[in-house]
Amino acid sequence: MSKFKIAVVLYTYDRTDDAKVNMDIITSLWQSSKIFSSIKIVHAFNGQRNWYPKKYKEDDLIRLKNPGHFQGASELIDAGIKKIQDKYKDVDYVVVLAPDTWLVKLNYLENIFKKMAKDELYLATCAWDKPDWKNIFEVGMAVDFFVFDFKWAKKYKMFPTNYKQFYDKYSDLFLYFRGSNVSLEKLIFSHYIRGILKQYNDNNGLKHLSLEKMLRLTDREPIHKDTKWTRQMYWPKMGLLTHHDIKPKKALLVKVKNIKGESIKKLLASKNVDYFNKH
């Protein structure tokens, strides 16, 4: 089996200690995998400079201004992917991660890439759903963790998302028809669907083809455990930790083998974790 060249886009506003631990996980645990020939980390950051004054373990650090939640995340993701397109053209797959989204079960991660390569799938993600609303075409996809085929996405222009351009043009319609904001989860998924349409030119079978060429990570569904959009934070089968509170995260991290790094060491050794993500 050929090895994969992957790149990680880590996008951060204020969860800087989460981002550092995430990089420790990637450069120790992920890097130990025999199926990756290289892992590049592109860190896109739009917080204040004094929150994150210098690089940690990323290959590239991109600094942007923060225009707000959805647009900010969109611009960070777009900037990270643009850097990969310009600098790491031979990458096979890109992993997009929020800083507080840690994946610590290596075999689960490896199986995602093996399945995508074997079945020629272009996207791995799950629905941003809740128990009574599971249609991914309506709720969109998780954007705190997803994987995509880099060359396919580049060919069919899945990125940039250009959230601001879309928002400026259509936000009033969203408020008028749905009473809701423009969702980044839906916008990125719509760009994936558009790529499928460009490739196959089949309107009638578009939804079927979109699902057929996607690895749906149903182990994470539903992401929200009730109809009030209360988030689940831990998926043991995946080894996926997304807590905002560091204390339960730390308790789980203690049990993970083959991870190391300065930020992990500091976290596990600290009796008081009040320093974490504090600015």
Which residue stretches match the model-derived regions?
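Short beta-strand-to-loop acidic/aromatic patch adjacent to the donor-nucleotide binding site
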Residues: V91-W102
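A conserved hydrophobic helix/loop-capping motif in glycosyltransferases and polysaccharide synthases
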Residues: I6-D18
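Short loop->beta transition adjacent to catalytic acidic/histidine clusters or analogous donor-positioning motifs
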Residues: F4-I6, L29-V42, D59
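Conserved catalytic core of nucleotide-sugar-dependent glycosyltransferases
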Residues: W102-H191, G195-K198
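Phosphate/oxyanion-binding active-site loops and adjacent basic polyanion-contact surfaces
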Residues: R15-A19, H69-I77, K105, F189
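C-terminal catalytic/acceptor-binding lobe
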Residues: D168-H279
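Active-site-proximal specificity loops/subdomain of glycosyltransferases
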Residues: H43-D90
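Short, well-formed alpha-helical segments that are part of the catalytic scaffolds
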Residues: R15-S32
